[in-house]
Amino acid sequence: MVVDYENIANTIDFYALDGKRSFSRSYQIDFNVEPVRRLTVSATFRYTDARIEMKERGLTEKPLTSRYKGVLNLQYATNLNKWVFDFTASINGKSRVYSFMEGLRDENGKLLYKDGYSPAYPLLYLQVTKRFKGIDIYLGAENLTNFRQKNLLVGTPMEGTAGHGGMAAVNTALPDFDASAVWGPIMGTKVYLGLRYTLWK
């Protein structure tokens, strides 16, 4: 089953492959090492080639699917694992956006997807854990780069309104409204505090 957002304007088209091609090839490399005692370094790189044959367009790159992703994780634990420090950095590759997104512009009038692809973007995560007998207390932060997808809502701007980042609010009543064209983070930096309790071992 193909879910096609691009065949007919303002319409989601559902149809069977009917002998057409659809595939996803993924290649992944993993690397793990402990350069010094209690310090673990892990790295992963994945490349994805996902394509689907669309009506009258032939074999097309699957939209909103990242071409590649790289992840680096550093974890250090003190003696007896009383403290654990965890840092993760990732780079997320570009992905093809829907054709109706190619004309979208930012608050300065610049095209967001001039080549038809989303930008590559980095993400950083940090977590510190203090371990007691049967209880872990952890403090962490996600998306430390505070990267967020611009113009998350697609549609016709409403006159006389200003939304996030100075952009006009989108008219949700019109048929060109779309809130599903998501390729990146929609929330900025988030800090959290948690408690983990072990009932038994």
What are these regions (language model features)?
Residues 2, 14-16, 184-185, 189:
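Feature marks flexible
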Residues 5-101, 196-198:
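Gram-negative outer-membrane beta-barrel transporters
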Residues 9-16, 53-58, 106-112, 120-121, ...:
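Extracytoplasmic loops and strand-loop junctions of Gram-negative outer membrane beta-barrel proteins
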Residues 19, 116-117, 183:
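Short Gly/Pro-enriched turn/cap motifs at secondary-structure boundaries
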Residues 25, 68, 122, 135, ...:
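Exposed loop/turn and edge beta-strand positions of beta-sandwich/beta-sheet ligand-binding modules
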Residues 34-36, 65, 119, 130, ...:
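Surface-exposed coil/turn segments at beta-strand junctions on protein surfaces, enriched
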Residues 91-105, 130-201:
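C-terminal beta-signal and adjacent terminal beta-strands/loops
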